[in-house]
Amino acid sequence: KFNFHLKSPFLMIKIKLKDEFIKLGQALKAAGLVDSGVVAKIVIQDGEVLVNGEVETRRGKKLYGGEVVSFDGQEIHIVK
């Protein structure tokens, strides 16, 4: 028997860059993982968001192709 305790089912989301980069808060909104910039700011400042496996507390952190954001059991892959 296996017991998996995830907040929500694992999901991988890809965001294709339209520009050179996307900011972390915008990426969370674009992926549909938060409803607003205010919520994005709170979860980021609370240390709930990882970028490439490291806690990131800057909402304005620029994300480039190849980077991975993790939040609430989900992964966002930034694609060029």
Regions of interest found by a model, annotated:
Residues 11-22:
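A detector for short, charged/polar N-terminal pre-domain segments
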